[in-house]
Amino acid sequence: MKFSVKNILEMEVCLALGCTEPVAIALGAAAAATLLPGLKFDHIHLIIDPNIYKNGLAVVIPGSGGLTGLDTASALGAFGGDAYGKLEVLSSLSPEMVARASAFLAEGRVKVDLREESGLYVKTTISGGGHVAESLITDVHTNIVSLMLDGEEVADPRLVATEAMSTGNKLAELEEWLRSLTLEDILDLTNELDEADLDFLEEGVQHNLRLAEYGLKHGSGLGIGKDIDRLLKQKLLVKDMTTSARMLTSAAADARMDGVNLPAMSSGGSGNHGLTAILPIWAIKDFIETDRESVLRAIGLSHIITAYIKAHTGRLSAVCGCSVAAGAGATAGITYLVGGDLQQVEGAIKNILEDLAGVICDGAKAGCAIKLNTAAGAAVQAALFSLQGVSVKDTDGIIGDSTRQTVQNIGDLSNYGMVATDKTILKIMRAKHKKG
């Protein structure tokens, strides 16, 4: 089956309020809660996969007043989530809703269990008023495949995907098609972007810029972006392409990981991927002669490359997708924008994958801003090196003789080579959580 660039944007690029893993938990709880209108909840039981656990454990939830936690995300979704809002499920949280969820949590009414099998999985069971409601999300953060009340399936076409319309099934088909593409095919797709697509891409820029501006103004989270700005003013750093990309991208991550109530335009199922795929390209445009259309086409290319690599590595894994997938997307977009040809775009992708392939994902948290800072800077560097004729040789390590082969190798590293790494990361994080 052949897809179009519009299909990629529709399925891979969307607004997300808050980190997508706790948001998926909130969505599952909100969906189950719709089956118990007006009833007092007695208990919530959550069963999740290891990577949802890892990415949802420590990140601040928007609108919560600084709260974190898997159980918190579930309670907030149940008491204040809009099940029809998808990744913006928590956009209407009020202080009263947060207070009710907090009281529910304080009474120990939420239980979280870990599913050993990998693959995105969020099962939420809510009991109340003598009834039991259940939702199940699989494969994709918004893909509700089942809603049940007292053991009976509930049909809600606005919430529950049929097998034919399942986001998970459609995404699997899209990813299979993406894996068949060459870099030349991907560059051709960029030429198919029409004015409506460019407007949508520009909307994503504006959303992610708002996060960056907030981070720069308030020093949210770790304050990496604001600190870079301070170092520039102290003349300890020089404002160039690399520093500008790092500052803008990390500032947005600072704000997002601190739970600021502003949505991000996500890419490949992750808001932080969206920040990395978009903002470095936007930052470097001021250093070259270019125009709106060229910048937005470069960002479109970045999203496609991000989706292409995620189709190989998997939605969630031990590999930091901001570094490997969105970082590669950004460097491809930068190279394209500065005037690079097919060979130079390929060289830039090889450069950044050689540089950052070993960066692990140890969950979403404030420290992600440091990783996005690194990815943004490396994306600029990899592009500039390639434009100067410097690219990693095909004989080096995991680098292949083409972008396709290199990305396949990264996929093997992620899906097979780092399984034990992922388990070890999770073991360390769970031990810390139990101590806390």
Curated annotation (Swiss-Prot):
It holds the Pfam family SDH_alpha. InterPro entries: Ser_deHydtase-like_asu, UPF0597. One of its GO terms (molecular function) is L-cysteine desulfhydrase activity. GO terms for biological process: L-cysteine catabolic process to pyruvate. Belongs to the UPF0597 family. This is UPF0597 protein DP0591.
